[in-house]
A protein has these predicted regions:
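Transmembrane helix boundary and interhelical loop/hinge segments in multi-pass membrane proteins
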Residues: 1-20
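Short helix-loop-helix connector
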Residues: 16, 20, 51, 86-87, ...
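Alpha-helical transmembrane-bundle signature of multi-pass membrane transport and export proteins
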Residues: 20-21, 172
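Alpha-helical transmembrane segments and their short interhelical loops
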Residues: 22-97, 144-168
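Membrane-interfacial helix-loop-helix junctions in multi-pass membrane proteins
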Residues: 104-162
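Short cytosolic juxtamembrane segments of multi-pass membrane proteins
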Residues: 171-179
């Protein structure tokens, strides 16, 4: 979203004339979005602990925040790609909502994966939100399964790296096109 405002009001043109690469600008935007997400997640986690939600291992807060940052880097890559390519804010928000809601609803955030129909759990297996939700839930409950955690982290690393590369490419290619 910030990229759209930067393009509209001319700040992006100033940033593009600086001696840093366009990829660095995209990475900076992604990291800024990820830090905001980490701050929001820490607030939610803090409120949850304050109202009595228990975690068997408080030292898991650090790894949980790392997972949140890893996932948000990937999802912010989608946001940066769309913001660089979108011609209007309406287009950007329409596509973000079109992608975001199904990703959320097709994850086990609201309904357990084990109780989903086979066709739906097959779709959820390709959803990075699924791996984030499962891993954070396991970490908060204290019952982390080794292979499940390794698979989740692997999927999130691949997702984040892929979105980092794609966002850098799309941002470099599209950001200075007319708005």
């Amino acid at each position: 979203m910030n990229t759209l405002w930067d393009r509209r009001y001319g700040f992006m043109n100033k940033a593009l004339t600086s001696p840093i690469s366009r990829s660095s600008i995209a990475l900076g935007k992604m990291l800024a979005i990820s830090m905001i997400a980490a701050f929001q997640a820490s607030l939610i986690l803090g409120i949850a602990l304050a109202i009595g939600v228990s975690m068997p291992h408080l030292w898991m807060i650090g790894p949980i925040m790392a997972i949140v940052i890893l996932f948000s880097i990937g999802f912010s890559g989608i946001s940066v790609m769309l913001a660089a390519a979108a011609k209007s804010q309406e287009t950007f928000w329409g596509i973000i909502n079109f992608l975001g809601m199904p990703l959320f609803l097709l994850s086990p955030a609201l309904f357990p994966l084990a109780l989903m129909p086979d066709w739906l759990s097959s779709i959820a297996a390709f959803n990075p939100v699924t791996y984030t939700v499962v891993l954070v839930r396991e970490m908060m409950s204290g019952f982390v399964e080794g292979w499940s955690a390794l698979l989740s982290v692997s999927v999130l690393v691949v997702f984040s790296l892929a979105m980092l590369g794609l966002a850098s490419y799309v941002f470099t290619r599209d950001v200075n096109k007319p708005f």
